[in-house]
Amino acid sequence: MKTIQELVPLIHQWAKEREIYEQLIPFDELLKTHEEVVELIKACYDDDKPAIQDAIGDVMVTMINYCYMERIDVLEQINDVLNFEGKRSDSKVMLSLSIQDSLTRLMHANFRLLGIGGETPFLCFYEIITIIGYLDDIAFLENTTLEECLNIAYNEIKNRKGKIINGKFIKD
């Protein structure tokens, strides 16, 4: 199993090879994140551990891509979460819904930046850390880790081919 520190550059390379960073904008990646979060909510509601692990990994892949597009050090964000020792929630469904709330705020902040440019506001950093933290909490409740979930997602996509159509990567 690869570490998160090993997986992040591999995911960057995967996305570069598929021209995701060249052909999409950060908001496109947040829309993809939204799709993956909806799958996570459903998996948590169904209490489907394999689907939860897959969805956590998929959300992480899209967040890694978003952070790369916004020039945010995603490893720093992940390390901040993994080093936090606060109280964890005990409801996967509530945590997954909270991810959706944080993602909506991140999308709103990002949408305001479209056409404006400039520095990424603090709110974006806060919401990224919050989303990763909730993902880590759900993984913990499933007796797994972000690292294991990200490995599952990377192993699923690493050989995937496709193309960008209308602002979305479509797998072959």
PLM segments and residue spans:
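Flexible "arm" and connector segments at domain edges
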Residues: 1-56, 60-172
